[in-house]
């Protein structure tokens, strides 16, 4: 059962937490600006900046935020000043989010990822989070608590949520549970115990993100990337509380002006999807600031995923990245206006706590449920059951009766009973889990268990009957087989084989399979040769008849006489050396082309010494020569 707990007190309303907005100015690149050497943005102090008013060049517009970082600010300053303070909220079951916003080429990915010498927000946050959980787990107040950290990494590409840890080319759905938590069913989750584990999963996954080159950015992100770090704090003793905090680290794709980027084809389609989702994001911010009854979170996958971060239950930090060049003036102005509106959004963080309760107190039971329970117990008493099967019901009824008097007991006695229940739970006794089950569910489970036991007994009896029938059928088969095998070879005209019936459902024997010894059939020429008294085949050996159930085994072996084979080979060789094209074509596997090849080879190299010399011809292999001999030997002998 999930409980939503406030930051300060469970019985008070949740405290409000405004979205904190920080602005980072990218260093000025003189080589990119062809119009003017001066920057269009200038920082005033650590929280405010000014930009030239495009309507009146003599005026400037000032903006104030939670933090402003100039072009000389380091990655560490940004992380320590705006991000690290939200991480402790994860250890008490609250959500947090950090997302980078700004036009293309303003440095969002550098702020979130960085490089090996200057790591960004993501690696620093993961490293500190791992260190915080190790420190908290070693404290005496968390002796019975364990911490588990998992990560998921997805991208929103053309309004499709794609898994980056295990790419499947499948659009993942975004769902909302009964406690209004946003989740992605089916997304890959990897457990991380050290920063090395994180690097092992994150670096290959980052290479799966879609990037491309445009006129404004050599490595432009074509999708929104979302890294989800989940921290789960679990209590190992009763009441087994569980606190779950989620950290969203989001690198948004930048808005693009296709007239300047020169996007075409697939890049134009990607740019349209990016601009559409960012426009929906601005509509969500406007609706939250105006207090509208409907917030268009569902109009885009991006805003649906950011629902917790904007007007939801997370501690949110937005880092707006801007560029100082004159050609980015309107992009910078749009980003500053969006950041100014975002800092007015109010979130209401809660601790997401799940408690595995012990047994529900009987005082909380409704009168109707008590009446149904009593009626069910009276009906069970009237039913006829075995004494052994009724003993669990009796013990559980007694336990229920003891629970009914719990509210009337002395508080000290109640406390001792709860301690005893805790001891039983820690020892892993099955009865503790059984007592925590509602009575109606308990009786339904027992009824199903009894029915399954009866079904098992019926199946056992049926199995015994089938085994007995199989044994009887096997005995009859063995007796019949022995009588058949005792017959003499001269009187045997057929041998009957029966398959054993072990495992069959019926005792009826299978139909007999008969193997008959049939006379060998040959062609007319071969038959006439045999009738003339020239024995072509000689009898080698008769195999014994086997009655072990193997069928289709020949009982005779025959060999062709070797002198006839040699005679046939000589006649084939003679035909190869003296035959014309027509005579050669009368041989099997010899056509017009091969006949001409044989005559040509014979004219150049002289007569063949043996039939195997055919392999010397172009296009005739040794395997084909063997096939040629087999195909012609019998017909040559019979002719």
Curated annotation (Swiss-Prot):
<keyword id="KW-0067">ATP-binding</keyword>
<dbReference type="Pfam" id="PF12836">
    <property type="entry name" value="HHH_3"/>
</dbReference>
<dbReference type="GO" id="GO:0005524">
    <property type="term" value="F:ATP binding"/>
</dbReference>
<dbReference type="InterPro" id="IPR001752">
    <property type="entry name" value="Kinesin_motor_dom"/>
</dbReference>
<keyword id="KW-0505">Motor protein</keyword>
<dbReference type="GO" id="GO:0005634">
    <property type="term" value="C:nucleus"/>
</dbReference>
<dbReference type="InterPro" id="IPR027417">
    <property type="entry name" value="P-loop_NTPase"/>
</dbReference>
<keyword id="KW-0238">DNA-binding</keyword>
<dbReference type="GO" id="GO:0003677">
    <property type="term" value="F:DNA binding"/>
</dbReference>
<feature type="compositionally biased region" description="Polar residues">
    <location>
        <begin position="388"/>
        <end position="397"/>
    </location>
</feature>
<feature type="binding site">
    <location>
        <begin position="102"/>
        <end position="109"/>
    </location>
    <ligand>
        <name>ATP</name>
    </ligand>
</feature>
<dbReference type="GO" id="GO:0005737">
    <property type="term" value="C:cytoplasm"/>
</dbReference>
<keyword id="KW-0175">Coiled coil</keyword>
<keyword id="KW-0963">Cytoplasm</keyword>
<dbReference type="GO" id="GO:0003777">
    <property type="term" value="F:microtubule motor activity"/>
</dbReference>
<dbReference type="GO" id="GO:0007018">
    <property type="term" value="P:microtubule-based movement"/>
</dbReference>
<dbReference type="GO" id="GO:0008017">
    <property type="term" value="F:microtubule binding"/>
</dbReference>
<keyword id="KW-0206">Cytoskeleton</keyword>
<keyword id="KW-0539">Nucleus</keyword>
<feature type="short sequence motif" description="Important for regulated proteolytic degradation">
    <location>
        <begin position="549"/>
        <end position="552"/>
    </location>
</feature>
<keyword id="KW-0493">Microtubule</keyword>
<protein>
    <recommendedName>
        <fullName>Kinesin-like protein KIF22</fullName>
    </recommendedName>
</protein>
<dbReference type="InterPro" id="IPR019821">
    <property type="entry name" value="Kinesin_motor_CS"/>
</dbReference>
<comment type="similarity">
    <text>Belongs to the TRAFAC class myosin-kinesin ATPase superfamily. Kinesin family.</text>
</comment>
<dbReference type="GO" id="GO:0005874">
    <property type="term" value="C:microtubule"/>
</dbReference>
<dbReference type="InterPro" id="IPR036961">
    <property type="entry name" value="Kinesin_motor_dom_sf"/>
</dbReference>
<keyword id="KW-0547">Nucleotide-binding</keyword>
<keyword id="KW-0832">Ubl conjugation</keyword>
<feature type="coiled-coil region">
    <location>
        <begin position="439"/>
        <end position="484"/>
    </location>
</feature>
<feature type="region of interest" description="Disordered">
    <location>
        <begin position="358"/>
        <end position="400"/>
    </location>
</feature>
<feature type="domain" description="Kinesin motor">
    <location>
        <begin position="18"/>
        <end position="345"/>
    </location>
</feature>
<comment type="function">
    <text>Kinesin family member that is involved in spindle formation and the movements of chromosomes during mitosis and meiosis. Binds to microtubules and to DNA.</text>
</comment>
<dbReference type="Pfam" id="PF00225">
    <property type="entry name" value="Kinesin"/>
</dbReference>
<dbReference type="InterPro" id="IPR010994">
    <property type="entry name" value="RuvA_2-like"/>
</dbReference>
<dbReference type="InterPro" id="IPR027640">
    <property type="entry name" value="Kinesin-like_fam"/>
</dbReference>
């Amino acid at each position: 059962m999930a409980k939503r707990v406030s930051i300060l007190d469970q019985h008070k309303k949740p405290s409000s937490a405004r979205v904190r907005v920080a602005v980072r100015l990218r260093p000025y690149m003189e080589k990119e600006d062809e119009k003017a050497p001066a920057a269009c943005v200038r920082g005033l102090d650590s929280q405010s900046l000014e930009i030239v008013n495009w309507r009146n060049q003599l005026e400037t517009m000032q903006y104030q935020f939670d933090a402003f970082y100039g072009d000389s600010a380091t990655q560490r300053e940004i992380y320590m000043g705006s991000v690290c303070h939200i991480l402790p909220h994860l250890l008490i079951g609250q959500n947090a989010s950090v997302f980078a916003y700004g036009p293309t080429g303003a440095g969002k990915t550098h702020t979130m990822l960085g490089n090996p010498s200057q790591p960004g927000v993501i690696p620093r946050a993961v490293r500190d989070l791992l260190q915080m959980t190790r420190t908290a787990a070693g404290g005496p107040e968390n002796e019975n608590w364990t911490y588990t950290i998992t990560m998921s990494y997805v991208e929103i590409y053309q309004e499709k949520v794609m898994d980056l840890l295990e790419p499947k080319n499948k659009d993942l759905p975004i769902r909302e549970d009964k406690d209004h938590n946003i989740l992605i069913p089916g997304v890959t989750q990897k457990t991380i115990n050290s920063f090395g584990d994180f690097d092992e999963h994150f670096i290959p996954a980052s290479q799966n993100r879609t990037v491309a080159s445009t006129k404004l950015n050599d490595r432009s992100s074509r999708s929104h990337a979302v890294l989800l770090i989940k921290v789960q704090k679990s209590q190992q003793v009763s009441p087994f509380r569980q606190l779950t905090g989620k950290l969203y680290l989001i690198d948004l794709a930048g808005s693009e002006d296709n007239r300047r980027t020169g996007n075409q084809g697939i890049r134009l389609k990607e740019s349209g999807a990016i601009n559409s989702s960012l426009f929906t994001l601005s509509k969500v911010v406007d609706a939250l600031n105006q207090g509208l009854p409907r917030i268009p979170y569902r109009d885009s996958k991006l805003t649906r995923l950011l629902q917790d971060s904007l007007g939801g239950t997370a501690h949110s930090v937005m880092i707006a990245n801007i560029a100082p060049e004159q050609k980015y003036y309107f992009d910078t102005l749009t980003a500053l206006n969006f950041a100014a509106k975002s800092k007015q959004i109010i979130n209401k963080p809660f601790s997401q706590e799940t408690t595995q309760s012990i047994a529900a107190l009987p005082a909380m039971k409704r009168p109707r449920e008590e009446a149904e329970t009593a009626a069910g117990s009276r009906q069970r008493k009237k039913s006829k059951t075995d004494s052994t099967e009724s003993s669990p019901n009796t013990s559980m009824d007694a336990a229920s009766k003891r629970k009914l008097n719990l509210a009337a007991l002395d508080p000290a006695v109640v406390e001792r009973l709860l301690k005893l229940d805790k001891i039983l739970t820690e020892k892993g006794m099955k009865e503790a889990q059984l007592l925590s089950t509602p009575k109606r569910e308990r009786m339904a489970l027992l009824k199903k268990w009894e029915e399954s036991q009866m079904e098992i007994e019926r199946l056992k009896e049926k199995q015994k009957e089938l085994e007995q029938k199989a044994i009887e059928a096997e005995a009859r088969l063995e007796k019949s087989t022995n009588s058949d095998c005792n017959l003499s070879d001269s009187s045997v005209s057929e041998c009957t084989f029966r398959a054993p019936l072990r495992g069959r459902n019926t005792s009826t024997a299978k139909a007999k399979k008969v193997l008959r010894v049939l006379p060998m059939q040959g062609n007319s020429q071969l038959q006439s040769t045999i009738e003339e008294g020239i024995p072509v085949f000689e009898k080698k050996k008769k195999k014994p008849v086997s009655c072990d159930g193997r069928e289709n085994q020949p009982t005779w072996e025959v060999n062709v006489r070797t002198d006839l084979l040699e005679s046939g080979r000589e006649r084939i060789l003679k035909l190869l050396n003296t035959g014309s094209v027509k005579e050669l074509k009368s041989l099997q596997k010899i056509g017009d082309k091969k006949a001409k090849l044989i005559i040509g080879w014979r004219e150049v190299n002289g007569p063949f010494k043996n039939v195997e010399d055919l392999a010397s011809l172009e296009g005739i292999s040794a395997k084909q020569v063997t096939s040629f001999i087999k195909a012609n030997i019998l017909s040559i002998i019979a002719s």
